[in-house]
């Protein structure tokens, strides 16, 4: 209905233009008015936006204007022989910011996550995906073309998304982004072992003597490496995560350890915490020993917020037996011992 009414108004305007008691005239100063054009040294009326000149003026008759048809337009006063065609429909990675009508061309701009590589007189002609900043990086700005600039998150900030829009966020309080587990066992005679397998919910280290299994639930930091080293019948092993994911404080990261002797006994007992420096970080642990092959066991679990000035930590430890020192550390030069890892593991300071 609106388009019909608009066409009718344009039609009337054309009648008014052509019906005015104005005939082409010779300008006294050689110049025509803004809404006129010059033809054969005569000033003639231009057609208004939304119309075109179906017939140009002559010495006795002014310009005849006709409304633009569907899919065509003129956006200014003109004496064009036909209306201009509107741009085609926007691509899938674009949004239409202005539709085609008889007075305006269609305008397409890039959708969120894209930027323009080919601009036209009416919007963007071609868009491509913006760079996505990886975990640990955030959007810090944009190039002159509109692509994303990624910068590492600084101290006190973090990013756990792959995104072309997210900036680095302030580090959340009372949580952690790193878990380091150290397990000391005595006596251990067999230095042979196999690479740890990852199933998504558990990690395990197996030798001919024993099997260490850690089941984890609702833990956002991702366990990525593990190690096993034997020196003077003391095995030092453990698991640790990357530092690019923070624990969601609405969940409790739960670690359940089972240290099982493969050939000596089947009795089971659960250890109690020997040291409890845990604060309000969201975590929970259990440790179960199965069998009689070990006389001493130490377990240290460190939950850390490594991206703060004060390096916030919670430390949990378990101890059984009287041979191992509760403050013992992993050997500082583990690469000379039997080791399962892709790189030298970290250890407590």
Swiss-Prot record:
One of its GO terms (cellular component) is extracellular region. Disulfide bonds join 32-43, 44-57, 47-65, 68-83, 86-100, 90-108. GO terms for biological process: positive regulation of membrane protein ectodomain proteolysis; regulation of T cell proliferation; symbiont-mediated perturbation of host defense response. Keywords: Disulfide bond, Glycoprotein, Receptor, Repeat, Secreted, Signal. Its main location: secreted. Glycans are attached at residues 101, 189, 248. Residues 1-19 form the signal peptide. Pfam families: CrmD_SECRET (PF07190), TNFR_c6 (PF00020). GO terms for molecular function: tumor necrosis factor binding; tumor necrosis factor receptor activity. Induction: Expressed in the early phase of the viral replicative cycle. InterPro entries: Poxvirus_TNF-rcpt-II_C, Poxvirus_TNF_rcpt-II, TNF_chemokine_rcpt-like, TNFR/NGFR_Cys_rich_reg, TNFRSF_N_viral. It is found in: Secreted. TNFR-Cys repeats lie at residues 31-65, 67-108. It comes from the Viruses. SMART domains: TNFR (SM00208). Belongs to the orthopoxvirus OPG002 family. Inhibits host immune defense by binding to host TNF and various chemokines in the extracellular space. Binds host CC chemokines (beta chemokines) and CXC chemokines (alpha chemokines). This is Soluble TNF receptor II.
């Amino acid at each position: 209905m609106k388009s019909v009414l608009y066409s009718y108004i344009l039609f009337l305007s054309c009648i008014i233009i052509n019906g005015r008691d104005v005939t082409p005239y010779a300008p006294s100063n050689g110049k025509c008015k803004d809404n006129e054009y010059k033809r054969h040294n005569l000033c003639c009326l231009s057609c208004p936006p939304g119309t075109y000149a179906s017939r140009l003026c002559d010495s006795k008759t002014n310009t005849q204007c006709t409304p633009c048809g569907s899919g065509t337009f003129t956006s200014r006063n003109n004496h064009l022989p036909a209306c201009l065609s509107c741009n085609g429909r926007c691509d899938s990675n674009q949004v239409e910011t202005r539709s085609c009508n008889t007075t305006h061309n269609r305008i397409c701009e890039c959708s969120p996550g894209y930027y323009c590589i080919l601009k036209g007189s009416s919007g963007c002609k071609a868009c491509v995906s913006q760079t996505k900043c990886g975990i640990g990086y955030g959007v810090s700005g944009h190039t002159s073309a509109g692509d994303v600039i990624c910068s590492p998150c600084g101290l006190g900030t973090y990013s756990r998304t792959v995104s072309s829009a997210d900036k680095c966020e302030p580090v959340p309080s009372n949580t952690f982004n790193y878990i380091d587990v150290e397990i000391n066992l005595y006596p251990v005679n067999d230095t042979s072992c196999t690479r740890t397998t990852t199933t998504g919910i558990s990690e395990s280290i197996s030798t001919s003597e024993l099997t260490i299994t850690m089941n984890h639930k609702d833990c956002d930091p991702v366990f990525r490496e593990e190690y096993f080293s034997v020196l003077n019948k003391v095995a030092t092993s453990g698991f640790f995560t990357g530092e690019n994911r923070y624990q969601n404080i609405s969940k409790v990261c739960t670690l359940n350890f089972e240290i099982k002797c493969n050939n000596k006994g089947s009795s089971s007992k659960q250890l109690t915490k020997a040291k409890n420096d845990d604060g309000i970080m969201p975590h929970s642990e259990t440790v179960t020993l199965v069998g009689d092959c070990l006389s001493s066991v130490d377990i240290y679990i460190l939950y850390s917020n490594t991206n703060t000035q004060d390096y916030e930590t919670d430390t949990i430890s378990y101890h059984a037996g009287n041979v191992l020192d509760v403050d013992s550390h992993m050997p500082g030069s583990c690469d000379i011992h039997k080791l399962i890892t892709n790189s030298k593991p970290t250890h407590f300071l």
